[in-house]
Amino acid sequence: MARYTGPATRKSRRLRVDLVGGDMAFERRPYPPGQAGRARIKESEYLLQLQEKQKARFIYGVMEKQFRRYYAEANRRAGKTGENLVVLLESRLDNVVYRAGLANTRRQARQLVSHGHFTVNGKAIDVPSFRVSQYDIINVREKSQKMNWFEEAQDNLVDAVVPAWLQVVPENLRILVHQLPERAQIDIPLQEQLIVEFYSK
């Protein structure tokens, strides 16, 4: 599956948001790259909408074609299209693994899922974009639990703060999906209405 593998810090600086999580290089220089990076320029409405779309894409690690499919589905659903879009993105398996504290970044979570370390309701899943549902049970596969990474993660899970819509059982390396998230429970710096306006043109 195609994915962006370029320099994350440069993208973070361009979009003015930490796309990685704990990116010290971005914190030191949170302005766009280039000699004129520090200068303030007047941004057009279109540019603001485009940047917000790109921000969402890179936060969740989604390529353009796949992002369009997410938007199309969000638009078909009842309710606010922008909020539907964010909920769909947040419901990806790789994001759930990240939110549960089993990975330090979404990129790392995507890699762990791709390598087949998880099951959902007892079935092995290696597709990062797999969409979780309410009452799903996600486990680290038994043979993967002995890996150093998961042993260390297990210790850290005891004090981990996870979203209210998830529950983590550290001793079993298990994630329970109590419900799908609501927009108010998703703490990402995103103005999704700008994305709706971008695709509505």
Swiss-Prot record:
Q: Name one Pfam family in it.
A: Ribosomal_S4
Matches recorded under InterPro entries: Ribosomal_uS4 (IPR022801), Ribosomal_uS4_bac-type (IPR005709), Ribosomal_uS4_CS (IPR018079), Ribosomal_uS4_N (IPR001912), S4_RNA-bd (IPR002942), S4_RNA-bd_sf (IPR036986)
* Family annotation (CDD domains): S4
Stretches assigned to the S4 RNA-binding domain: 91-151
Q: Report which superkingdom the organism of origin falls in.
A: Bacteria
Alphabetically, the GO molecular function entries are:
rRNA binding; structural constituent of ribosome
Q: Which Gene3D superfamilies match?
A: Ribosomal Protein S4 Delta 41, Chain A, domain 1 (1.10.1050.10), RNA-binding S4 domain (3.10.290.10)
In its keyword annotation, does this UniProt entry include Ribosomal protein?
yes
**A single GO CC term, please?**
small ribosomal subunit
Q: Does the record carry RNA-binding as a key word? A: yes
Annotated keywords: Ribonucleoprotein, Ribosomal protein, RNA-binding, rRNA-binding
Question: Which Gene Ontology BP annotations are present?
Answer: ribosomal small subunit biogenesis; translation
Q: What does the similarity note say? A: Belongs to the universal ribosomal protein uS4 family.
Q: What does this protein do?
A: One of the primary rRNA binding proteins, it binds directly to 16S rRNA where it nucleates assembly of the body of the 30S subunit.
What do we know about how this protein assembles, alone or with others?
Answer: Part of the 30S ribosomal subunit. Contacts protein S5. The interaction surface between S4 and S5 is involved in control of translational fidelity.
Identification of the protein by name: Small ribosomal subunit protein uS4
Q: From which lineage does this chain's organism come? A: Bacteria, Bacillati, Actinomycetota, Actinomycetes, Mycobacteriales
